[in-house]
Protein backbone atom coordinates (compact mmCIF):
# COMPACT_ATOMS: atom_id res chain seq x y z
CA UNK A 1 0.00 0.00 0.00
CA UNK A 2 1.29 3.47 -0.86
CA UNK A 3 2.64 5.43 2.11
CA UNK A 4 0.27 8.30 1.31
CA UNK A 5 -2.71 6.03 2.02
CA UNK A 6 -4.08 6.20 5.56
CA UNK A 7 -6.96 4.02 6.76
CA UNK A 8 -7.50 2.96 3.11
CA UNK A 9 -8.37 6.54 2.08
CA UNK A 10 -6.20 9.19 0.44
CA UNK A 11 -5.63 12.34 2.55
CA UNK A 12 -5.71 15.50 0.43
CA UNK A 13 -3.95 18.82 0.91
CA UNK A 14 -4.28 21.70 -1.53
CA UNK A 15 -1.95 24.65 -0.92
CA UNK A 16 -2.75 27.93 -2.72
CA UNK A 17 -4.01 26.10 -5.81
CA UNK A 18 -4.94 28.29 -8.77
CA UNK A 19 -6.19 27.42 -12.23
CA UNK A 20 -6.34 29.99 -15.02
CA UNK A 21 -7.59 29.71 -18.59
CA UNK A 22 -6.02 32.72 -20.31
CA UNK A 23 -7.50 35.66 -18.35
CA UNK A 24 -10.23 33.58 -16.71
CA UNK A 25 -9.38 32.66 -13.10
CA UNK A 26 -11.38 29.54 -12.19
CA UNK A 27 -9.61 28.56 -8.95
CA UNK A 28 -7.93 31.34 -6.99
CA UNK A 29 -5.31 30.32 -4.40
CA UNK A 30 -7.59 27.67 -2.96
CA UNK A 31 -6.53 26.04 0.32
CA UNK A 32 -8.17 22.78 1.37
CA UNK A 33 -7.44 19.86 3.69
CA UNK A 34 -9.48 16.65 3.49
CA UNK A 35 -8.63 13.89 5.99
CA UNK A 36 -8.30 10.31 4.78
CA UNK A 37 -11.66 8.60 4.37
CA UNK A 38 -13.83 11.72 4.56
CA UNK A 39 -16.91 12.09 2.32
CA UNK A 40 -17.00 15.64 0.95
CA UNK A 41 -19.66 17.17 -1.30
CA UNK A 42 -18.85 20.23 -3.42
CA UNK A 43 -21.65 22.56 -4.49
CA UNK A 44 -21.84 25.96 -6.14
CA UNK A 45 -23.08 27.83 -9.16
CA UNK A 46 -22.18 26.73 -12.68
CA UNK A 47 -18.73 27.92 -13.68
CA UNK A 48 -17.60 28.29 -10.08
CA UNK A 49 -14.76 25.79 -10.34
CA UNK A 50 -16.30 22.57 -8.97
CA UNK A 51 -15.56 20.32 -11.93
CA UNK A 52 -12.19 21.99 -12.49
CA UNK A 53 -11.23 20.98 -8.94
CA UNK A 54 -12.14 17.35 -9.70
CA UNK A 55 -10.19 17.37 -12.96
CA UNK A 56 -7.10 18.62 -11.11
CA UNK A 57 -7.45 15.87 -8.52
CA UNK A 58 -7.97 13.27 -11.26
CA UNK A 59 -4.80 14.38 -13.04
CA UNK A 60 -6.76 15.41 -16.14
CA UNK A 61 -5.40 18.95 -15.78
CA UNK A 62 -2.51 20.58 -13.94
CA UNK A 63 -2.75 23.61 -11.64
CA UNK A 64 -1.46 26.97 -12.81
CA UNK A 65 0.04 27.44 -9.35
CA UNK A 66 0.06 25.70 -5.98
CA UNK A 67 0.48 22.15 -4.72
CA UNK A 68 -1.93 19.19 -4.81
CA UNK A 69 -0.76 16.59 -2.29
CA UNK A 70 -1.79 13.20 -0.97
CA UNK A 71 -0.46 13.59 2.55
CA UNK A 72 3.08 14.77 1.80
CA UNK A 73 3.29 13.08 -1.63
CA UNK A 74 2.32 14.86 -4.86
CA UNK A 75 -1.05 13.39 -5.83
CA UNK A 76 0.16 13.01 -9.42
CA UNK A 77 2.68 10.40 -8.24
CA UNK A 78 -0.03 8.03 -6.97
CA UNK A 79 -2.68 8.68 -9.62
CA UNK A 80 -3.37 4.93 -9.88
CA UNK A 81 -5.12 5.23 -6.50
CA UNK A 82 -7.69 7.69 -7.92
CA UNK A 83 -10.85 6.82 -9.86
CA UNK A 84 -13.53 9.11 -11.31
CA UNK A 85 -17.20 8.66 -12.22
CA UNK A 86 -19.13 10.97 -14.55
CA UNK A 87 -22.81 11.61 -15.30
CA UNK A 88 -22.36 9.40 -18.39
CA UNK A 89 -21.33 5.87 -17.38
CA UNK A 90 -18.99 5.73 -20.42
CA UNK A 91 -19.40 2.00 -21.02
CA UNK A 92 -18.09 0.48 -24.25
CA UNK A 93 -21.18 -0.90 -26.05
CA UNK A 94 -19.22 -3.64 -27.86
CA UNK A 95 -17.92 -5.12 -24.59
CA UNK A 96 -19.90 -7.16 -22.07
CA UNK A 97 -20.68 -5.83 -18.61
CA UNK A 98 -17.87 -7.81 -16.97
CA UNK A 99 -15.40 -6.76 -19.67
CA UNK A 100 -16.30 -3.12 -19.04
CA UNK A 101 -15.58 -3.61 -15.34
CA UNK A 102 -12.18 -5.14 -16.09
CA UNK A 103 -11.29 -2.65 -18.82
CA UNK A 104 -7.53 -2.16 -19.04
CA UNK A 105 -6.68 -4.84 -16.48
CA UNK A 106 -4.29 -7.70 -17.15
CA UNK A 107 -3.89 -11.13 -15.63
CA UNK A 108 -6.55 -12.94 -13.60
CA UNK A 109 -9.09 -10.17 -13.02
CA UNK A 110 -12.45 -11.85 -13.66
CA UNK A 111 -13.02 -13.05 -10.09
CA UNK A 112 -12.35 -9.53 -8.82
CA UNK A 113 -14.73 -8.14 -11.46
CA UNK A 114 -17.46 -10.54 -10.36
CA UNK A 115 -16.96 -9.47 -6.73
CA UNK A 116 -17.20 -5.82 -7.77
CA UNK A 117 -20.41 -6.52 -9.69
CA UNK A 118 -21.80 -8.39 -6.68
CA UNK A 119 -21.03 -5.37 -4.50
CA UNK A 120 -23.26 -3.20 -6.71
CA UNK A 121 -25.99 -5.85 -7.08
CA UNK A 122 -25.31 -6.85 -10.70
CA UNK A 123 -23.58 -10.21 -10.34
CA UNK A 124 -26.23 -11.82 -12.59
CA UNK A 125 -25.72 -9.33 -15.45
CA UNK A 126 -22.00 -9.98 -16.05
CA UNK A 127 -22.40 -11.49 -19.52
CA UNK A 128 -24.93 -8.97 -20.87
CA UNK A 129 -24.35 -5.99 -23.14
CA UNK A 130 -24.60 -2.41 -21.81
CA UNK A 131 -27.55 -1.74 -24.13
CA UNK A 132 -29.66 -4.13 -22.03
CA UNK A 133 -29.16 -2.06 -18.86
CA UNK A 134 -31.10 0.87 -17.45
CA UNK A 135 -29.38 4.18 -16.71
CA UNK A 136 -29.06 3.31 -13.04
CA UNK A 137 -27.63 -0.12 -13.82
CA UNK A 138 -25.05 1.41 -16.16
CA UNK A 139 -23.92 3.69 -13.34
CA UNK A 140 -23.64 0.66 -11.08
CA UNK A 141 -21.31 -0.92 -13.64
CA UNK A 142 -19.26 2.29 -13.72
CA UNK A 143 -19.08 2.15 -9.92
CA UNK A 144 -17.95 -1.49 -10.05
CA UNK A 145 -15.28 -0.49 -12.58
CA UNK A 146 -13.97 2.03 -10.05
CA UNK A 147 -14.17 -0.40 -7.11
CA UNK A 148 -12.13 -3.14 -8.78
CA UNK A 149 -9.09 -0.85 -8.53
CA UNK A 150 -9.54 -0.46 -4.75
CA UNK A 151 -9.21 3.33 -4.96
CA UNK A 152 -8.00 5.53 -2.16
CA UNK A 153 -9.82 8.48 -3.73
CA UNK A 154 -13.17 8.34 -5.56
CA UNK A 155 -14.18 11.44 -7.53
CA UNK A 156 -17.85 11.76 -8.49
CA UNK A 157 -18.79 14.42 -11.07
CA UNK A 158 -22.60 14.61 -11.04
CA UNK A 159 -22.84 10.81 -11.46
CA UNK A 160 -26.53 10.66 -10.53
CA UNK A 161 -27.77 13.74 -12.35
CA UNK A 162 -29.47 11.90 -15.23
CA UNK A 163 -31.27 9.30 -13.09
CA UNK A 164 -34.92 9.27 -12.02
CA UNK A 165 -35.68 10.20 -8.42
CA UNK A 166 -36.09 6.68 -6.99
CA UNK A 167 -33.03 5.28 -8.78
CA UNK A 168 -31.07 8.29 -7.60
CA UNK A 169 -31.96 7.58 -3.96
CA UNK A 170 -30.96 3.92 -4.38
CA UNK A 171 -27.61 4.95 -5.85
CA UNK A 172 -27.02 7.44 -3.05
CA UNK A 173 -27.53 4.67 -0.49
CA UNK A 174 -25.27 2.29 -2.45
CA UNK A 175 -22.41 4.77 -2.73
CA UNK A 176 -22.58 5.64 0.97
CA UNK A 177 -22.71 1.95 1.92
CA UNK A 178 -19.65 1.10 -0.20
CA UNK A 179 -17.78 4.12 1.18
CA UNK A 180 -18.50 2.92 4.72
CA UNK A 181 -17.26 -0.58 3.85
CA UNK A 182 -14.06 0.41 2.04
CA UNK A 183 -13.03 3.67 3.70
CA UNK A 184 -11.90 5.53 0.57
CA UNK A 185 -11.98 9.33 0.41
CA UNK A 186 -14.88 10.73 -1.67
CA UNK A 187 -15.36 14.06 -3.41
CA UNK A 188 -18.85 14.44 -4.90
CA UNK A 189 -19.67 17.39 -7.15
CA UNK A 190 -23.42 17.98 -7.30
CA UNK A 191 -25.90 20.76 -8.06
CA UNK A 192 -28.39 19.08 -5.69
CA UNK A 193 -27.88 20.54 -2.21
CA UNK A 194 -30.25 17.99 -0.64
CA UNK A 195 -28.10 15.20 -2.11
CA UNK A 196 -24.97 16.85 -0.73
CA UNK A 197 -26.21 17.06 2.87
CA UNK A 198 -27.80 13.60 2.73
CA UNK A 199 -24.59 11.86 1.65
CA UNK A 200 -21.58 13.82 2.88
CA UNK A 201 -19.70 14.44 6.13
CA UNK A 202 -18.89 17.91 4.91
CA UNK A 203 -20.26 20.31 2.29
CA UNK A 204 -18.03 22.84 0.52
CA UNK A 205 -19.41 25.79 -1.42
CA UNK A 206 -17.03 27.14 -4.06
CA UNK A 207 -17.47 30.82 -4.92
CA UNK A 208 -15.19 32.75 -7.27
CA UNK A 209 -12.58 30.02 -7.09
CA UNK A 210 -12.38 29.90 -3.30
CA UNK A 211 -14.11 28.04 -0.47
CA UNK A 212 -17.06 30.26 0.42
CA UNK A 213 -18.62 27.88 2.95
CA UNK A 214 -17.26 24.82 4.75
CA UNK A 215 -20.12 23.08 6.54
CA UNK A 216 -19.90 19.99 8.75
CA UNK A 217 -22.91 17.67 8.43
CA UNK A 218 -23.31 16.63 12.07
CA UNK A 219 -26.02 14.02 11.55
CA UNK A 220 -25.54 10.35 12.45
CA UNK A 221 -26.04 7.64 9.85
CA UNK A 222 -28.26 6.19 8.55
CA UNK A 223 -29.87 9.54 7.77
CA UNK A 224 -33.62 9.87 7.58
CA UNK A 225 -35.10 11.72 4.62
CA UNK A 226 -37.27 14.60 5.74
CA UNK A 227 -35.46 15.10 9.05
CA UNK A 228 -35.56 18.61 10.46
CA UNK A 229 -31.77 18.84 10.81
CA UNK A 230 -31.18 17.83 7.18
CA UNK A 231 -33.65 20.49 6.07
CA UNK A 232 -31.91 23.11 8.23
CA UNK A 233 -28.49 22.35 6.75
CA UNK A 234 -29.87 22.35 3.22
CA UNK A 235 -31.48 25.74 3.86
CA UNK A 236 -28.21 27.13 5.24
CA UNK A 237 -26.32 26.21 2.07
CA UNK A 238 -29.08 27.41 -0.26
CA UNK A 239 -29.37 30.74 1.53
CA UNK A 240 -25.65 31.31 1.10
CA UNK A 241 -25.78 30.45 -2.60
CA UNK A 242 -28.83 32.65 -3.20
CA UNK A 243 -27.41 35.55 -1.19
CA UNK A 244 -24.34 35.53 -3.39
CA UNK A 245 -26.46 35.44 -6.52
CA UNK A 246 -28.58 38.37 -5.28
CA UNK A 247 -25.46 40.43 -4.57
CA UNK A 248 -24.16 39.80 -8.09
CA UNK A 249 -27.48 40.93 -9.57
CA UNK A 250 -27.35 44.18 -7.57
CA UNK A 251 -23.80 44.86 -8.75
CA UNK A 252 -24.81 44.35 -12.40
CA UNK A 253 -27.90 46.51 -11.95
CA UNK A 254 -26.17 49.45 -10.27
CA UNK A 255 -22.59 49.05 -11.53
UniProtKB/Swiss-Prot annotation:
The complex is composed of two ATP-binding proteins (SsuB), two transmembrane proteins (SsuC) and a solute-binding protein (SsuA). Its EC number is 7.6.2.14. This is Aliphatic sulfonates import ATP-binding protein SsuB. Residues 12-233 form the ABC transporter domain. SUPFAM superfamilies: P-loop containing nucleoside triphosphate hydrolases. Transmembrane segments: none annotated. Coiled coil: none annotated. Part of the ABC transporter complex SsuABC involved in aliphatic sulfonates import. Responsible for energy coupling to the transport system. It is found in: Cell inner membrane. InterPro entries: AAA+_ATPase, ABC_transporter-like_ATP-bd, ABC_transporter-like_CS, ABC_transporter_ATP-bind, P-loop_NTPase. It catalyses: ATP + H2O + aliphatic sulfonate-[sulfonate-binding protein]Side 1 = ADP + phosphate + aliphatic sulfonateSide 2 + [sulfonate-binding protein]Side 1. Belongs to the ABC transporter superfamily. Aliphatic sulfonates importer (TC 3.A.1.17.2) family. Its main location: membrane. It is a peripheral membrane protein. Signal peptide: none annotated. ATP binds at residues 44-51. SMART domains: AAA.
